[in-house]
Amino acid sequence: SFDLSPGRVLGIVGPNGAGKSTLLRLLYRYHKPTSGTVEIGGTDIWKITARSAARKVAAVLQEQPTDFALTVREIVTLGRTPYSVGFGGSNGARDALIVDAALNRMDLNGFSNRSMGTLSGGERQRVMVARALAQEPCVLILDEPTNHLDIRHQLEILELIKDLPLTIITSLHDLN
């Protein structure tokens, strides 16, 4: 059991197989707890719709597909899905502003029209964080955000996320 104040960063550290990812999956509704509750702002995330939960919690997973046939902008725009109107409709100008802000925050403006498959590992990870930011969550969950990245890209990702105005829960197995 833990309580985390808004705007704080919680690092979950442990060796491979210790249950870090399982805990995170409980927090972003991939697994339903067999007992207890997961609450955000006093609301049990299993007592609200998946769409409402996706407006509260965004996750960047340790293993991401890399064969997207989408541009960086299209992937980041997927973060607006919990706010879509009707079947696939968008909130137009507001969504565009939020996507632009997420791209800017992750220093991806020059990449917006590039295909995901042409990016380096660090660039792809920044895209996935930008997609999560476009969800406008209260809580950002990062499962091994520096996994498979060289030291330069690890530092780049950590630098970009450290000042985000969100509650961040991240798992790490490498303390370096």
Labelled PLM ranges:
Residues 28:
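Helix-to-loop junction immediately C-terminal to a conserved catalytic motif
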Residues 140-144, 149:
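Catalytic Walker B motif of ABC-type/P-loop ATPase nucleotide-binding domains
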Residues 136:
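Conserved catalytic motifs of ABC-family nucleotide-binding domains
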Residues 13-15:
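The feature captures the beta-strand-to-loop junction immediately N-terminal to the Walker
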Residues 115-119, 123:
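Conserved ABC ATPase signature
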Residues 77, 92-111:
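Conserved ABC ATPase "signature" region
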